């Protein structure tokens, strides 16, 4: 009986007699046969006609050339990238070394702070190029009559050497009248000036009793007499009343004009003491005002009309007598309620702080204890949408002039102005109470020397 072929062929590892007697272990011939068959299949392709072969050769050569071209371009690109990368790395390394050499031996934070200052200075310089400076630094915008009055001042005195501030110097020299605040910006005094903190600009020419609603524009040199625009809402920039105060005499304000021109004439009539030498210039200046208004056909808002309209909206006079204006619903009586005590009772409480026979600490404690229920009632009023009550008491605390009450005043003014959507007044009030001064010279330029 013939033996079967082992499935492992000559690769079988079994050597036992039983397996060898049963199976043959020949070499695997099929592999060679398959190889031969494959060789026969390939051979006809290699023996094709010469024309076909040349065509195929051309077809095969073209992709090869393209591949070579692509390979060459790719290689060039890689070389360029490597070169650029090397150049970039070298440049980066060079810059790094330069930066490290500059920083070496120096305080890194000082360098960083210097860069920040340069950035802030650049922003400030850009801001000085437009009237946006006024809104940004003083948090308010000026009415049209303000800019018209500035043009008039420029016509009073023309000096090519000082085109912007010749008029200001003329009014100061002849009438002892300083045009300050936003007028100084128009005169170019803030350009190139030393930078201050935000609060410094809000305190610029802000006298001791000036509430946030008031902004100084005129000052009688060397005195506490000053005039300014009154805004019940920070965004107000049309038909603003102008008020007057003498900080040496107290906190009361008086509305004197409905525009800057009339305020100037009021000053010339009431706060300027003319001499025989200045009478001629006084008369000439008054005529110049009338001529300018006539030539430019300016119709300016008048005091009587503006004050009459405002009085309808005043809910409480307060200590400064100018009154406060808040939204008030006549039907529901929501928006304001009277304080828990009258003005006279409130003044009696505060009078204890002025007594010299009572220890200041004890007086302060006693006054605060009496004021606390009044303040609590005002805060409850705020919770019930009567925001005017907290505003009234806060203004009264501020106008009392006692710095011991600043914290109480702030605790009333902040929520009141916040609920009335007057955040600019919060910033102004806080900045003022931080450094409140009885000085007459309150210019930022002297503060930053």
UniProtKB/Swiss-Prot annotation:
ZnF start-end (CCHC-type): 3-28
Any single Pfam family the record assigns to this protein: HPF1
Signal sequence range: none
UniProt GO molecular function: histone binding; poly-ADP-D-ribose binding; zinc ion binding
Main location: nucleus
Domain of life from the UniProt record: Eukaryota
Keyword terms of this UniProt record: Chromosome, DNA damage, DNA repair, Metal-binding, Nucleus, Phosphoprotein, Zinc, Zinc-finger
InterPro entries: APLF_PBZ (IPR019406), HPF1 (IPR019361)
Spans annotated as Disordered: 18-93
GO cellular component term, pick one: site of DNA damage
GO biological process, one term: DNA repair-dependent chromatin remodeling
Sequence positions bearing Phosphoserine: 72
Catalytic residues (positions): 384 (proton donor)
Subcellular location: Chromosome; Nucleus
Basic and acidic residues bias (residue ranges): 28-41, 54-69
Family recorded in the similarity comment: Belongs to the HPF1 family.
Purpose of the protein: Cofactor for serine ADP-ribosylation that confers serine specificity on Parp. Switches the amino acid specificity of Parp from aspartate or glutamate to serine residues. Acts by completing the active site of Parp: forms a composite active site composed of residues from HPF1/CG1218 and Parp.
PANTHER family assigned to the protein according to its UniProt record, in alphabetical order: HISTONE PARYLATION FACTOR 1
Full protein name: Histone PARylation factor 1-like
Organism (species): Drosophila melanogaster
């Amino acid at each position: 009986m013939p033996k079967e072929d082992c499935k492992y062929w000559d690769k079988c590892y079994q050597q036992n007699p039983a397996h060898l007697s049963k199976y043959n272990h020949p070499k695997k011939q099929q592999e060679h046969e398959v190889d031969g068959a494959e060789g026969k299949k390939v051979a006809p392709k290699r023996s094709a006609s010469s024309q076909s072969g040349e065509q195929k050769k051309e077809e095969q050569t073209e992709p090869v050339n393209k591949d070579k071209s692509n390979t060459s371009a790719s290689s060039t690109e890689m070389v360029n990238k490597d070169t650029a990368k090397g150049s970039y790395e070298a440049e980066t390394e060079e810059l790094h070394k330069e930066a490290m050499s500059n920083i070496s031996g120096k305080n890194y934070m000082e360098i960083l702070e210097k860069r920040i200052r340069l950035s802030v200075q650049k922003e400030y310089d850009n801001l000085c190029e437009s009237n946006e400076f006024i809104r940004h630094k003083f948090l308010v915008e000026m009415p049209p009559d303000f800019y018209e009055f500035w043009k008039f001042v420029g016509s009073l005195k023309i000096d090519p050497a000082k085109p912007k501030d010749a008029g200001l110097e003329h009014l100061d020299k002849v009438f002892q009248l300083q045009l300050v605040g936003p007028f100084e910006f128009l005169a170019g005094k803030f350009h190139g000036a030393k930078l201050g903190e935000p609060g410094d600009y809000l305190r610029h020419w802000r006298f001791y009793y000036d509430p946030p609603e008031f902004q100084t524009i005129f000052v009688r040199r060397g005195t506490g007499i000053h005039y300014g625009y009154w805004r019940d809402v920070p965004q107000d920039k049309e038909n603003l009343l102008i008020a007057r105060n003498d900080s040496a005499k107290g906190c009361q304000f008086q509305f004197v004009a409905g525009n800057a021109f009339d305020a100037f004439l009021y000053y010339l009539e009431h706060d300027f003491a003319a001499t025989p030498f200045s009478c001629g210039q006084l008369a000439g200046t008054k005529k110049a005002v009338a001529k300018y208004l006539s030539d430019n056909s300016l119709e300016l808002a008048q005091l009587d009309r503006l004050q009459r309209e405002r009085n309808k909206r005043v809910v409480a006079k307060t200590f400064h007598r100018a009154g406060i204006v808040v939204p008030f619903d006549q039907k529901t009586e929501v928006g304001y309620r009277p304080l828990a005590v009258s003005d006279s009772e409130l003044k009696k409480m505060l009078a204890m702080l002025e007594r010299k026979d009572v220890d200041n600490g004890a007086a302060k404690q006693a006054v605060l204890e009496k004021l606390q229920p009044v303040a609590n009632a005002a805060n409850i009023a705020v919770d019930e949408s009567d925001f005017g009550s907290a505003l009234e008491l806060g203004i009264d605390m501020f106008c009392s002039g006692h710095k011991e009450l600043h914290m109480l005043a702030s605790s009333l003014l902040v929520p009141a102005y916040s609920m009335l959507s007057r955040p600019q007044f919060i910033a102004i009030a806080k900045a003022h109470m931080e450094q409140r001064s009885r000085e007459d010279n309150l210019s930022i330029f002297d503060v930053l020397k």
